[in-house]
From Swiss-Prot:
Its main location: membrane. It comes from Yersinia pestis bv. Antiqua (strain Angola). Keywords: Antiport, Cell inner membrane, Cell membrane, Ion transport, Membrane, Sodium, Sodium transport, Transmembrane, Transmembrane helix, Transport. The keyword Transferase does not apply. Belongs to the NhaB Na(+)/H(+) (TC 2.A.34) antiporter family. It is found in: Cell inner membrane. The chain crosses the membrane at residues 13-33, 98-118, 140-160, 239-259, 304-324, 356-376, 390-410, 446-466, 477-497. PANTHER family: NA(+)_H(+) ANTIPORTER NHAB, TRANSPORTER ARSB-RELATED. This is Na(+)/H(+) antiporter NhaB. It is a multi-pass membrane protein. InterPro entries: Na+/H+_antiporter_NhaB. GO terms for cellular component: plasma membrane. The lineage of its organism: Bacteria, Pseudomonadati, Pseudomonadota, Gammaproteobacteria, Enterobacterales. Na(+)/H(+) antiporter that extrudes sodium in exchange for external protons.
């Protein structure tokens, strides 16, 4: 049956997304300019933030790049922000974009080694509780020295590998796309696959939270940590020690949550690795070991050496540049010289890189319209004793709906400005820096918006395979969110001041001399 031009345009608009979703996006595009010009730019700015969060929440209905991008283009077009401000935000976050483009692609060329190591881990640790703890601890440790996005990229790569191996076997070795379950013809296989999905979901969430537990501890764990450390004049050791009064209790309780949710099967956790899947992975491992040639063994050794280089080099150059060196070294010594083979490595990260660039446009609107200014002013007007908790809570709240790099940067700049103008003392500024860092890193696990690693997981090729939606991520993160936020708040409120004083008296902390530029330690 023929359709009209209007119907054809509507069908093409956002493709196979539900009609109600298409109407919602069109509604946003109509309402936003009206509110901006006739009601209030401030209200329109907050509406844009909420609408962008909505597109992220509906990531499984439609990839957020298209609807979010349309909203961002309109925001620039009507004057909510300027192309210059967007370009400035992109320039400020160039490290993160380079990380996504090159580091994630670099990890792709180390997949053989990662699959080899994690298959051994998965098959040798039969207790799901201990395995979950191992994933959480490994992610926390790696995130203290690597960027959380890199760690998540590793775990995603491994999980896709596991899923592909089992899916190919259970769908009768079909060469079809692994997103297509039509080759699985009996009920038992479907149930096993669903259980395997639940198993992978729980491991991914434990690993994701692990990146937050480890990432908050060191100045290289998250991009905003570097900004905060630079502003306060702390080196690697200073930063680690100053954070300990808050981060150590949170780390311990975070691991406790990991054990409890697995043991009592709470919040979607507790799914075991199905025995059928274990058999398939064991057979795959045995066959792979038997077939492995000397050439392939040398590839694994080369990839292991490159892995060591990856960890050591992160302190020598920008993360993205290290990622580029990983691509060059891995492809050179593993014999990958075909352009088509190289291109596959970039497929996973580039859509998310584009989405993150759109996100920076939304951040530019937040800056241009001063959406966070009333909250910041309210916090700075509070008494010094209340400031720490308020900074922590408002940082956490705003980081859950915005980019934690942006929130951390805005707050540390405001705190630094308050110190330079004599509103807060040096000691108070340093305590505020701890509250800001922990506030941006801990409560932000509540939603994928707050943590770039969570957002990357949500929009990755793995999420639809294991049925990991925005809502499910929020639900599964809830026990961690509550415990980490509350323990962090108690640490800021009751432990931070006395422990910092004790560490200073014990000689573990030296007071920096802060100039008008950058803080410089004695």
């Amino acid at each position: 049956m023929d359709i009209t031009n209007r119907q054809a345009v509507l069908k093409n608009f956002l493709g196979n997304s539900p009609d109600w979703y298409k109407l919602a996006i069109m509604g946003f595009l109509i309402i936003n300019p009206l509110v901006f010009f006739f009601v209030s730019p401030f209200v329109a700015g907050w509406m844009l933030v909420i609408e962008f969060i909505f597109t992220l929440a509906m990531a499984l209905k439609c990839y957020p790049l298209q609807p979010g991008g349309l909203l961002a283009i309109q925001a620039v077009a009507i004057g909510m922000t300027s192309p210059h401000q967007v370009a400035e935000e992109i320039a400020n976050n160039l490290e993160v974009l380079l990380l996504l483009v090159f580091m994630v692609a670099g990890i792709y060329f180390m997949k053989q080694l990662l699959l080899f190591v994690f298959t051994k881990l998965l098959l040798n640790i039969r207790s799901k509780t201990i395995l979950s703890l191992a994933f959480c601890l490994a992610s926390a440790f790696l995130s203290a020295f690597l960027d959380a996005l890199t760690v998540i990229a590793v775990v995603i790569s491994v999980s896709v590998g596991f899923y592909t191996i089992y899916h190919n076997v259970t769908s009768n070795h079909s060469d079809k796309d692994i997103t297509d379950d039509s080759g699985i013809d009996n009920q038992d296989s479907h149930e096993t696959l669903e259980q395997f999905r639940a198993f992978l979901r729980s491991l991914m969430m434990h690993a994701g939270v692990g990146t937050a537990l480890g990432g908050v501890m060191t100045m290289v764990g998250e991009p905003q940590n570097l900004i905060i450390a630079k502003s306060a004049g702390w080196n690697f050791a200073d930063f680690f020690i100053r954070m300990l009064p808050v981060t150590l209790p949170v780390f311990i309780f975070g691991l406790l949550v990991c054990l409890l949710v697995e043991k009592f099967k709470l919040f979607g956790y507790g799914a075991q690795l199905p025995e059928r899947v274990r058999q398939v992975l064991t057979e795959y491992d045995q066959q792979a070991n038997a077939k492995r040639t000397k050439q392939e063994k040398m590839k694994l050794i080369v990839q292991a050496i490159i892995g060591v280089w990856l960890v050591l080099a992160l302190h020598l150059a920008e993360v993205g540049l290290v990622g580029l060196s990983v691509i060059i070294l891995a492809t050179s010594f593993c014999g990958i010289t075909n352009e088509h083979s190289l291109g596959k490595a970039f497929q996973e990260a580039l859509p998310f890189t584009a989405l993150l660039t759109v996100f920076f446009a939304v951040v530019a609107v937040i800056i241009e319209q001063s959406l966070f200014t009333p909250i910041i002013q309210f916090v700075l007007q509070a008494s010094p004793s209340a400031q720490l908790s308020l900074f922590y809570l408002f940082n956490g709240l705003l980081s859950s709906v915005s980019d934690n790099v942006f929130v951390g940067t805005v707050y540390i700049n405001e705190a630094r400005s308050a110190f330079e103008h004599g509103i807060v003392s040096l000691q108070q500024f340093e305590l505020l820096a701890v509250a800001i860092n922990t506030g941006t890193n801990l409560p932000s696990v509540a939603t994928p918006n707050g943590q770039a690693a969570f957002l990357f997981l949500l929009t990755s090729a793995l999420a639809p395979l294991i049925r990991l939606s925005y809502g499910r991520m929020v639900y599964m993160a809830l026990p961690y969110t509550l415990v980490m936020t509350i323990v962090g708040l108690l640490g800021v409120e009751f432990l931070l001041v006395p422990m910092t004083e004790w560490l200073t008296q014990a000689g573990w902390i030296s007071l920096p001399h802060i100039t008008n530029g950058v803080a410089i330690p004695h």
